[in-house]
Amino acid sequence: MTDAPSRRGFIKQCGIVSAGLVAGTAAKAEGAPCPPAATNPPAHNEIPFYGSHQAGITTPAQKHIYFLVADLHSDDREKIQEMFQMWTAYSLNLTRGEHVKPYSKNLYIPPTDTGEADSLNPHNLTLTFGVSPSFFSKLKMEHLRPAELADLPHFPRDQLQAAYTDGDLCIQACADDPQVAFHAVRNLVRGARLNLTMRWSQAGFNSYDSASETPRNLFAFKDGTANFSGENLDKVVWCDGDNWLNGGSYLIARRIKMFLETWDRTSLGEQHNTFGRYRDSGAPMGQHEEHEPINLALT
Protein backbone atom coordinates (compact mmCIF):
# COMPACT_ATOMS: atom_id res chain seq x y z
CA MET A 1 0.00 0.00 0.00
CA THR A 2 1.43 3.36 -0.97
CA ASP A 3 1.18 6.48 1.16
CA ALA A 4 -1.26 8.03 -1.30
CA PRO A 5 -3.50 5.22 -2.58
CA SER A 6 -5.61 5.85 -5.62
CA ARG A 7 -9.39 5.95 -5.49
CA ARG A 8 -9.46 2.71 -7.48
CA GLY A 9 -7.01 1.07 -5.09
CA PHE A 10 -9.04 2.06 -2.07
CA ILE A 11 -12.26 0.88 -3.67
CA LYS A 12 -10.72 -2.48 -4.51
CA GLN A 13 -9.40 -2.98 -0.99
CA CYS A 14 -12.45 -1.77 0.87
CA GLY A 15 -15.11 -2.99 -1.53
CA ILE A 16 -16.83 0.37 -1.64
CA VAL A 17 -18.09 0.43 -5.17
CA SER A 18 -20.70 3.15 -5.03
CA ALA A 19 -19.71 4.52 -1.65
CA GLY A 20 -16.75 6.60 -0.78
CA LEU A 21 -16.04 8.68 2.25
CA VAL A 22 -19.17 10.48 3.26
CA ALA A 23 -19.73 10.65 0.40
CA GLY A 24 -17.37 9.40 -2.26
CA THR A 25 -17.72 8.62 -5.91
CA ALA A 26 -19.94 6.48 -8.09
CA ALA A 27 -17.37 5.58 -10.70
CA LYS A 28 -17.17 1.98 -11.86
CA ALA A 29 -14.52 0.02 -9.94
CA GLU A 30 -12.65 -3.16 -10.79
CA GLY A 31 -14.35 -6.23 -9.38
CA ALA A 32 -17.77 -4.57 -9.27
CA PRO A 33 -20.75 -6.07 -11.08
CA CYS A 34 -20.70 -4.70 -14.61
CA PRO A 35 -23.98 -3.04 -15.63
CA PRO A 36 -25.50 -3.77 -19.02
CA ALA A 37 -24.30 -1.42 -21.73
CA ALA A 38 -26.56 1.62 -22.01
CA THR A 39 -28.10 1.81 -25.47
CA ASN A 40 -30.71 4.46 -24.70
CA PRO A 41 -30.73 7.65 -22.63
CA PRO A 42 -32.14 7.36 -19.09
CA ALA A 43 -35.90 6.96 -18.94
CA HIS A 44 -38.15 9.75 -17.71
CA ASN A 45 -37.89 10.22 -13.94
CA GLU A 46 -34.63 8.26 -13.87
CA ILE A 47 -31.25 9.59 -12.68
CA PRO A 48 -28.22 7.45 -13.67
CA PHE A 49 -26.59 5.62 -10.77
CA TYR A 50 -23.06 5.76 -12.18
CA GLY A 51 -21.24 9.02 -12.84
CA SER A 52 -18.20 11.16 -12.07
CA HIS A 53 -19.68 11.86 -8.63
CA GLN A 54 -22.32 10.17 -6.52
CA ALA A 55 -25.82 11.29 -7.39
CA GLY A 56 -27.84 12.93 -4.64
CA ILE A 57 -25.24 15.55 -3.68
CA THR A 58 -25.55 18.26 -6.33
CA THR A 59 -28.57 16.66 -8.01
CA PRO A 60 -31.58 19.03 -8.05
CA ALA A 61 -33.40 18.39 -4.78
CA GLN A 62 -36.24 15.87 -4.95
CA LYS A 63 -39.43 16.10 -2.90
CA HIS A 64 -38.63 13.44 -0.31
CA ILE A 65 -35.68 11.98 1.58
CA TYR A 66 -35.17 8.93 3.76
CA PHE A 67 -31.84 9.06 5.60
CA LEU A 68 -30.45 6.17 7.63
CA VAL A 69 -27.38 5.70 9.83
CA ALA A 70 -26.23 2.18 10.66
CA ASP A 71 -23.69 0.41 12.86
CA LEU A 72 -21.51 -2.40 11.57
CA HIS A 73 -21.41 -5.50 13.76
CA SER A 74 -18.79 -7.22 11.63
CA ASP A 75 -15.13 -6.35 11.23
CA ASP A 76 -14.70 -8.90 8.44
CA ARG A 77 -13.52 -6.81 5.51
CA GLU A 78 -14.45 -9.49 2.98
CA LYS A 79 -18.05 -9.59 4.24
CA ILE A 80 -18.32 -5.80 4.09
CA GLN A 81 -16.89 -5.87 0.58
CA GLU A 82 -19.56 -8.35 -0.47
CA MET A 83 -22.21 -6.15 1.16
CA PHE A 84 -21.17 -3.11 -0.86
CA GLN A 85 -21.03 -5.14 -4.05
CA MET A 86 -24.58 -6.31 -3.36
CA TRP A 87 -25.66 -2.73 -2.64
CA THR A 88 -24.15 -1.61 -5.94
CA ALA A 89 -26.18 -4.14 -7.91
CA TYR A 90 -29.33 -3.40 -5.90
CA SER A 91 -28.90 0.37 -6.25
CA LEU A 92 -28.47 0.16 -10.00
CA ASN A 93 -31.77 -1.73 -10.25
CA LEU A 94 -33.61 0.50 -7.79
CA THR A 95 -32.68 3.71 -9.59
CA ARG A 96 -34.06 2.15 -12.77
CA GLY A 97 -37.38 1.40 -11.07
CA GLU A 98 -36.70 -2.34 -10.95
CA HIS A 99 -36.75 -4.91 -8.15
CA VAL A 100 -33.48 -5.44 -6.29
CA LYS A 101 -33.57 -8.97 -7.73
CA PRO A 102 -36.09 -10.71 -9.99
CA TYR A 103 -38.94 -12.40 -8.14
CA SER A 104 -38.64 -16.13 -7.56
CA LYS A 105 -41.52 -18.46 -8.38
CA ASN A 106 -40.89 -20.38 -5.16
CA LEU A 107 -43.86 -19.73 -2.85
CA TYR A 108 -42.07 -21.21 0.17
CA ILE A 109 -39.41 -18.51 0.54
CA PRO A 110 -39.75 -14.77 1.24
CA PRO A 111 -39.98 -12.55 -1.86
CA THR A 112 -36.63 -11.19 -3.04
CA ASP A 113 -38.06 -7.64 -3.01
CA THR A 114 -40.45 -6.23 -0.41
CA GLY A 115 -42.64 -4.98 -3.26
CA GLU A 116 -44.16 -1.75 -1.95
CA ALA A 117 -42.77 0.15 -4.97
CA ASP A 118 -44.18 -2.27 -7.55
CA SER A 119 -45.63 -0.40 -10.57
CA LEU A 120 -44.08 2.90 -9.42
CA ASN A 121 -41.52 4.59 -11.66
CA PRO A 122 -38.12 5.58 -10.16
CA HIS A 123 -39.34 9.11 -9.34
CA ASN A 124 -35.77 10.42 -9.77
CA LEU A 125 -34.44 8.16 -7.02
CA THR A 126 -30.83 8.76 -6.00
CA LEU A 127 -28.88 6.66 -3.51
CA THR A 128 -25.88 8.19 -1.79
CA PHE A 129 -23.58 6.30 0.58
CA GLY A 130 -21.04 7.50 3.10
CA VAL A 131 -18.78 6.16 5.82
CA SER A 132 -17.57 7.66 9.09
CA PRO A 133 -14.28 7.64 11.07
CA SER A 134 -15.39 4.55 13.01
CA PHE A 135 -15.86 2.66 9.74
CA PHE A 136 -12.12 2.85 9.14
CA SER A 137 -11.36 1.88 12.73
CA LYS A 138 -13.61 -1.19 12.76
CA LEU A 139 -12.12 -2.49 9.52
CA LYS A 140 -8.55 -1.66 10.63
CA MET A 141 -8.08 0.82 7.79
CA GLU A 142 -7.14 3.95 9.75
CA HIS A 143 -4.25 4.64 7.37
CA LEU A 144 -6.81 5.37 4.65
CA ARG A 145 -8.91 7.78 6.70
CA PRO A 146 -8.44 11.40 5.54
CA ALA A 147 -7.17 13.70 8.28
CA GLU A 148 -10.12 16.03 7.71
CA LEU A 149 -12.56 13.28 8.69
CA ALA A 150 -12.68 13.86 12.44
CA ASP A 151 -15.27 14.28 15.17
CA LEU A 152 -17.01 17.64 15.24
CA PRO A 153 -16.10 20.03 18.05
CA HIS A 154 -18.65 21.01 20.66
CA PHE A 155 -20.95 23.82 19.55
CA PRO A 156 -22.65 26.24 21.96
CA ARG A 157 -26.07 25.03 23.14
CA ASP A 158 -25.53 21.51 21.80
CA GLN A 159 -27.92 18.99 23.34
CA LEU A 160 -26.74 15.87 21.58
CA GLN A 161 -28.38 12.52 22.29
CA ALA A 162 -26.23 9.40 22.14
CA ALA A 163 -28.87 7.48 20.20
CA TYR A 164 -28.60 9.99 17.34
CA THR A 165 -24.84 10.45 17.41
CA ASP A 166 -22.02 8.58 15.64
CA GLY A 167 -22.63 5.49 13.49
CA ASP A 168 -20.45 3.73 10.92
CA LEU A 169 -22.16 4.44 7.61
CA CYS A 170 -25.13 6.24 6.13
CA ILE A 171 -27.55 5.77 3.26
CA GLN A 172 -29.40 8.73 1.77
CA ALA A 173 -32.34 7.99 -0.52
CA CYS A 174 -33.97 10.95 -2.29
CA ALA A 175 -36.96 10.67 -4.62
CA ASP A 176 -40.07 12.51 -5.70
CA ASP A 177 -42.17 9.82 -4.01
CA PRO A 178 -41.76 8.93 -0.30
CA GLN A 179 -42.59 5.27 -0.81
CA VAL A 180 -39.89 4.88 -3.46
CA ALA A 181 -37.26 6.37 -1.13
CA PHE A 182 -38.31 4.23 1.85
CA HIS A 183 -38.51 1.09 -0.28
CA ALA A 184 -34.95 1.57 -1.48
CA VAL A 185 -33.44 1.91 2.00
CA ARG A 186 -35.59 -0.89 3.38
CA ASN A 187 -34.33 -3.35 0.78
CA LEU A 188 -30.69 -2.29 1.07
CA VAL A 189 -30.76 -2.79 4.84
CA ARG A 190 -32.75 -5.99 4.52
CA GLY A 191 -30.08 -7.50 2.32
CA ALA A 192 -27.30 -6.47 4.72
CA ARG A 193 -28.91 -7.38 8.05
CA LEU A 194 -26.16 -9.92 8.87
CA ASN A 195 -23.56 -7.14 8.83
CA LEU A 196 -25.29 -4.09 10.28
CA THR A 197 -28.13 -2.72 12.35
CA MET A 198 -29.98 0.56 12.00
CA ARG A 199 -28.92 3.25 14.47
CA TRP A 200 -31.42 5.94 13.50
CA SER A 201 -33.35 7.19 10.52
CA GLN A 202 -35.13 10.36 9.47
CA ALA A 203 -37.70 11.11 6.79
CA GLY A 204 -38.01 14.57 5.29
CA PHE A 205 -39.87 16.47 2.59
CA ASN A 206 -39.53 19.53 0.38
CA SER A 207 -42.32 20.91 -1.78
CA TYR A 208 -40.32 23.59 -3.61
CA ASP A 209 -38.53 23.42 -6.94
CA SER A 210 -35.00 24.17 -5.74
CA ALA A 211 -33.83 24.78 -9.31
CA SER A 212 -35.95 27.94 -9.56
CA GLU A 213 -36.87 28.94 -6.00
CA THR A 214 -35.27 28.85 -2.56
CA PRO A 215 -37.25 26.38 -0.41
CA ARG A 216 -38.94 27.45 2.82
CA ASN A 217 -38.50 25.62 6.12
CA LEU A 218 -41.30 24.95 8.61
CA PHE A 219 -40.72 28.38 10.16
CA ALA A 220 -41.83 29.71 6.72
CA PHE A 221 -38.47 31.41 6.05
CA LYS A 222 -36.42 30.76 2.93
CA ASP A 223 -33.73 28.19 3.70
CA GLY A 224 -30.72 27.87 1.41
CA THR A 225 -30.30 31.43 0.15
CA ALA A 226 -26.52 31.30 0.52
CA ASN A 227 -26.07 27.86 -1.05
CA PHE A 228 -23.44 27.74 -3.78
CA SER A 229 -24.25 26.94 -7.40
CA GLY A 230 -22.44 26.36 -10.68
CA GLU A 231 -18.64 26.59 -10.63
CA ASN A 232 -18.60 27.82 -7.04
CA LEU A 233 -20.50 24.71 -6.00
CA ASP A 234 -17.93 22.45 -7.64
CA LYS A 235 -15.08 24.27 -5.90
CA VAL A 236 -16.67 23.97 -2.47
CA VAL A 237 -18.31 20.53 -2.55
CA TRP A 238 -15.88 18.21 -4.35
CA CYS A 239 -12.53 17.07 -2.97
CA ASP A 240 -9.63 17.64 -5.36
CA GLY A 241 -6.68 16.09 -3.53
CA ASP A 242 -4.28 13.47 -4.86
CA ASN A 243 -5.73 10.62 -2.80
CA TRP A 244 -8.57 8.16 -3.31
CA LEU A 245 -11.18 10.73 -2.22
CA ASN A 246 -10.63 12.94 -5.27
CA GLY A 247 -14.10 13.66 -6.65
CA GLY A 248 -15.80 12.74 -3.39
CA SER A 249 -17.22 14.96 -0.68
CA TYR A 250 -18.02 15.26 3.04
CA LEU A 251 -21.38 15.28 4.78
CA ILE A 252 -22.58 16.34 8.22
CA ALA A 253 -26.06 15.28 9.33
CA ARG A 254 -27.57 16.98 12.38
CA ARG A 255 -31.14 16.63 13.64
CA ILE A 256 -32.56 20.00 14.70
CA LYS A 257 -35.55 20.26 17.00
CA MET A 258 -37.99 22.94 15.86
CA PHE A 259 -40.36 24.29 18.53
CA LEU A 260 -43.20 25.13 16.17
CA GLU A 261 -45.80 25.84 18.86
CA THR A 262 -43.56 28.48 20.45
CA TRP A 263 -42.69 29.92 17.04
CA ASP A 264 -46.35 30.22 16.10
CA ARG A 265 -46.85 32.52 19.10
CA THR A 266 -43.92 34.76 18.12
CA SER A 267 -44.63 38.15 16.54
CA LEU A 268 -43.69 38.64 12.91
CA GLY A 269 -41.25 41.39 13.84
CA GLU A 270 -39.43 39.13 16.29
CA GLN A 271 -39.38 36.37 13.66
CA HIS A 272 -37.66 38.82 11.30
CA ASN A 273 -35.14 39.70 14.02
CA THR A 274 -34.42 36.03 14.70
CA PHE A 275 -33.42 35.33 11.10
CA GLY A 276 -32.22 38.79 10.16
CA ARG A 277 -34.40 38.55 7.06
CA TYR A 278 -37.94 39.35 5.99
CA ARG A 279 -40.21 36.34 5.83
CA ASP A 280 -42.04 37.21 2.62
CA SER A 281 -39.11 38.08 0.34
CA GLY A 282 -36.18 36.49 2.12
CA ALA A 283 -34.36 39.81 1.80
CA PRO A 284 -31.86 40.83 4.51
CA MET A 285 -33.05 43.45 7.00
CA GLY A 286 -33.10 46.87 5.34
CA GLN A 287 -33.04 45.38 1.82
CA HIS A 288 -35.69 44.43 -0.74
CA GLU A 289 -34.34 41.41 -2.64
CA GLU A 290 -33.32 37.99 -1.32
CA HIS A 291 -29.75 38.07 -2.61
CA GLU A 292 -28.84 41.65 -1.72
CA PRO A 293 -25.85 42.18 0.63
CA ILE A 294 -26.38 41.75 4.37
CA ASN A 295 -25.92 44.70 6.72
CA LEU A 296 -24.92 43.00 9.96
CA ALA A 297 -25.45 46.22 11.91
CA LEU A 298 -29.20 45.82 11.34
CA THR A 299 -29.45 42.24 12.60
What are the functions of these language-model segments?
Residues 29-31:
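Boundary at the C-terminal end of the N-terminal hydrophobic targeting segment
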